[in-house]
Amino acid sequence: MKTRKQDEELLLYSQGQLAFLASQRQRKKAVIWSRIILSIGFLVLWQKGFDFEWIDDFYFSSPRAIGILFLQDLQDMSLLRHIGMTLWESVVSFLLIVTFSLILATLFWFLPGLGHTFEPFLIVLNSLPKSALAPLIIVWLGTGPKTIILCGMSVGIFGCILNLYQVFIQTDPERLKLIETLGGNRLQAFTKVVFPGSLPTFLSIAKTNIGLALVGVIIGEFLAGRQGLGYLIIYGEQVFKLDLLIMSIVILCAIAMLLYWLLSLLERQIEHRMLGM
């Protein structure tokens, strides 16, 4: 039974284009199934390594043990609180990174002299090791969620500002001249040309920074957290509870994949709307 989308494609595309779209769908399905098979194969091989004693359980943990611990911790809701705290801190850090970066990059574009003045300082700050500012932030603000959120911001904000600013100033000058010729001002040039033209790159930068925000939050939880997955990792290392440590790392990987997938979905929706305009 044909779907509405398939009926629309029959009206809009030629046979060659339809064949190309079909091949792309098949390729996408093959990639998805390959990932699933590789993941299952890795887990099976990992577990068999413990079953046949190829891996020393004193230094590592098995998928079965991690799964049992995960279900046990879910029952008393303690794990969900830690996951929720890390997720909340990461999302807030990411939103603050994107918001402040967009504001400052826009300001630098409207005031080129200001942008040239601050650019070398941003480069220096972005070149610092990602965990270098965290101890200083803890001294200033103490421990707590606000400190961890600021640690999350410090990892990605300087690079995000620089990248956005570079994208803005690399806008095709001929298009800007066209706006000026038609009597448009600098604000209209930004809203009609610069920002819309930079939106795909902006979304790509955002996808990168969601991972950086998560890294910064985990660093903050290592040093100043009393809740969160970073705190669980440090606690598991201190008491040599490897099941807890590895489970926390696996959950972090799942959170990173989820956030990246959500941003990719948002990116596709925006691109479809732009193409339909």
Predicted regions and their residues:
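Cytoplasmic-entry segments and transmembrane alpha-helices of multi-pass inner-membrane transporters
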Residues: 103-138, 162-169, 177
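Short helix-to-coil transition segments within interhelical loops
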Residues: 128, 168-174, 178-198, 238
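Transmembrane alpha-helix signature in integral membrane proteins
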Residues: 75-107
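Loop-to-helix entry region at the N-terminal start of transmembrane alpha-helices
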Residues: 81-89, 131, 139-160, 198, ...
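Transmembrane alpha-helical segments of polytopic membrane transport and secretion proteins
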Residues: 1-37, 261-277
